[in-house]
Amino acid sequence: MSTALAKPQMRGLLARRLRFHIVGAFMVSLGFATFYKFAVAEKRKKAYADFYRNYDSMKDFEEMRKAGIFQSAK
């Protein structure tokens, strides 16, 4: 004679699944945020710093003025 199967625990099933998935989602989002910071944001920040280190705004302005972009600065 076989014994009866144990009944599955139904109480708190949703809360337990949500807790597990919320922790997983938090870990994935934290990992992606870290990846984005180092793969995209740091490179972009370095590119901006390199550009503005050698940028001459007056030279750029004079080139645009000579090209006739500005109507008020002849």
Curated annotation (Swiss-Prot):
Signal peptide: none annotated. Residues 54-74 are mitochondrial intermembrane. InterPro entries: Cytochrome_c_oxidase_VIc (IPR051389), Cytochrome_c_oxidase_VIc/VIIs (IPR034884), Cytochrome_c_oxidase_VIc_sf (IPR037169). Pfam families: COX6C. Keywords: Membrane, Mitochondrion, Mitochondrion inner membrane, Transmembrane, Transmembrane helix. It is a single-pass membrane protein. GO terms for cellular component: mitochondrial inner membrane; respiratory chain complex IV. Pathway: Energy metabolism; oxidative phosphorylation. Residues 2-12 are mitochondrial matrix. The keyword Transmembrane applies. Gene3D superfamilies: Mitochondrial cytochrome c oxidase subunit VIc/VIIs. It is found in: Mitochondrion inner membrane. One of its GO terms (biological process) is oxidative phosphorylation. The chain crosses the membrane at residues 13-53. Component of the cytochrome c oxidase (complex IV, CIV), a multisubunit enzyme composed of 14 subunits. The complex is composed of a catalytic core of 3 subunits MT-CO1, MT-CO2 and MT-CO3, encoded in the mitochondrial DNA, and 11 supernumerary subunits COX4I1 (or COX4I2), COX5A, COX5B, COX6A2 (or COX6A1), COX6B1 (or COX6B2), COX6C, COX7A1 (or COX7A2), COX7B, COX7C, COX8B and NDUFA4, which are encoded in the nuclear genome. PANTHER family: CYTOCHROME C OXIDASE SUBUNIT 6C. Belongs to the cytochrome c oxidase subunit 6c family. Component of the cytochrome c oxidase, the last enzyme in the mitochondrial electron transport chain which drives oxidative phosphorylation. The respiratory chain contains 3 multisubunit complexes succinate dehydrogenase (complex II, CII), ubiquinol-cytochrome c oxidoreductase (cytochrome b-c1 complex, complex III, CIII) and cytochrome c oxidase (complex IV, CIV), that cooperate to transfer electrons derived from NADH and succinate to molecular oxygen, creating an electrochemical gradient over the inner membrane that drives transmembrane transport and the ATP synthase. This is Cytochrome c oxidase subunit 6C. The gene is COX6C.
